Design a protein with these regions (language model features):
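Rhodanese-like catalytic fold shared by cysteine-dependent sulfurtransferases
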Residues: 1-16, 20-125
Length: 125
């Protein structure tokens, strides 16, 4: 999915933007890509929280489901995942698909592209 499609999804309540970076990066603190922060109205489901430390295996299904539900992602909702460069976003997209979500896309350019385009909005905090 490209930048134009993500821009068109802004403000659309039928679409959920999901940032797979850390909560700190989501807030605009710590390491960032271009400008700090996130794409407006996105929620954060850190990819690192979806895997078990040490083994790299995914968390059990009930924990994955709880993380997705806590982020407000509803069944049947279109979801666009992103991160810094689409790697962590692929993890989130896989988990969403595993949990039965069938309308999931990855913003390939992610924040490496979005945050470097000064015409596009960013949020922090």
């Amino acid at each position: 999915m490209g930048k134009a499609e993500v821009r068109a999804a802004l403000g659309d309540p039928s679409v959920r933007l999901v940032n797979a970076l850390t909560r700190k990066q989501h807030a605009g603190d710590g390491a960032h890509y271009g400008r700090p922060g996130r794409i407006p109205d996105s929620t954060c489901v850190p990819a690192l929280m979806l895997v078990q430390r040490g083994t790299g295996m995914f968390q059990p299904l009930p924990e994955l489901r709880a993380a997705v539900e806590a982020a407000g992602i509803k069944p049947g909702q279109r979801v666009i995942t992103y991160c810094g460069g689409a790697i962590a976003a692929a993890c989130d997209a896989f988990v969403l698909t595993l949990l039965g979500h069938d309308d999931v896309a990855i913003y390939d350019g992610s924040l490496a592209e979005w945050s470097n385009d000064l015409s596009l909005p960013m949020e922090t905090g």
